[in-house]
Each structure stands twice: as structure tokens, then as C-alpha cells.
């Protein structure tokens, strides 16, 4: 009976000492990340929470970058134009 009472007292003490967050406190409220010393695999550091801890967020929570939209095949038409200029220069060099 005394052993059971001792175990229960130890468990109660451990619940007060061990944090429930399990890996770090949250970063600021609008960021889906945790303050950690080292980021886990699949995470990146966004900013510093304090001098020794980084705000680590998963790649899936990061905003997607805005990429410019290409209109048609603009890059292919430029490539054809440079090839034509090269052919014209070759014909003028060989005919001279």
C-alpha cells in the first residue's frame, strides 16, 4: 500500500514538471510553427524566436510563391529568332 502511494505521488510530481507541449512552444499566433533549437526533417526555419531558438514550420504550411505567368510559348519564339539570325550570319560569312 505504501509503495502504491509512493508511485502515485511520483506520478503527480512528474505531471507538474514535464511540459505538455511535447517539442516546443508555438511561434507567434499567425504562424504554423514551433520554437525549437533544431528544426526537424521536412521543416524550415522562418525566423528566430529568441537568441537560441528558431521558429520551425513544415514545408506544407509555407505559402506558395507567386510565379509570373508565361503567355503562350514566348520563350520558343525567341529561340527560333536567334536560330534564324545565326543562319543568316553564317550565310553572309560564307558568301563573302
Curated annotation (Swiss-Prot):
Major localisation: secreted
Record keywords: Antibiotic, Antimicrobial, Defensin, Disulfide bond, Secreted, Signal
The record's disulfide annotation reads: 27-55, 35-49, 39-56
Chain intervals with Basic residues compositional bias: 76-87
- Subcellular location, record wording: Secreted
For region Disordered, the annotated ranges are 74-96
Q: Which InterPro entries match?
A: Beta-defensin, Beta_defensin_dom
Which family does the record claim for this protein? Belongs to the beta-defensin family.
Q: What does this protein do?
A: Has antibacterial activity.
Q: List the protein's name.
A: Beta-defensin 132
Question: Organism classification, top ranks?
Answer: Eukaryota, Metazoa, Chordata, Craniata, Vertebrata
